[in-house]
């Protein structure tokens, strides 16, 4: 009740009315990528991320990608032992909006897959950089990491890509 009275008095003070007949459709552009982009990771223009630690690289799709896909309902992953090639598909993500191939940002051999995604594919939405990782590989060409984007470059890439659409 107190909150309702405060809201009413504030609306009166600001001359706000819920019965306003003026309907405006504001036009504005958002010049900032609102997705999480983490420092310390490398990013591919196809919206996959890589976390390289020692002889292992963990790969998943970015927060930006999962946001555009919507609710993820199914994930297809390769088997351990399979080789992946930079720029080539290694799996797929199916959402309520679309099915998208997932490309490997670097080449290597799959040493582990996130089996938790089988029962909970939504982990890609809720935790794309932690619980929603997809595969771990042993890179065959670690120098391929140098061609990927850092956090600032990826943020700029997303902003430009979103502005173009």
UniProtKB/Swiss-Prot annotation:
Where does the Lipoyl-binding domain lie?
Answer: 56-138
- Report quaternary structure and partners: The glycine cleavage system is composed of four proteins: P, T, L and H.
Q: Which residues carry this modification: N6-lipoyllysine?
A: 97
Q: Where in the cell is it found?
A: Mitochondrion
Please give the cofactor(s) recorded in the UniProt entry for this protein.
(R)-lipoate
A GO biological-process term: glycine decarboxylation via glycine cleavage system
Gene label: GDCSH
- CDD domains this protein is in? GCS_H
Stored PANTHER family: GLYCINE CLEAVAGE SYSTEM H PROTEIN, GLYCINE CLEAVAGE SYSTEM H PROTEIN 1, MITOCHONDRIAL-RELATED
Q: Write out the GO cellular component annotations.
A: glycine cleavage complex; mitochondrial matrix
The annotated transit peptide is positioned at 1-34
Q: Does the keyword Mitochondrion apply?
A: yes
Query: What's the protein called, per UniProt?
Result: Glycine cleavage system H protein, mitochondrial
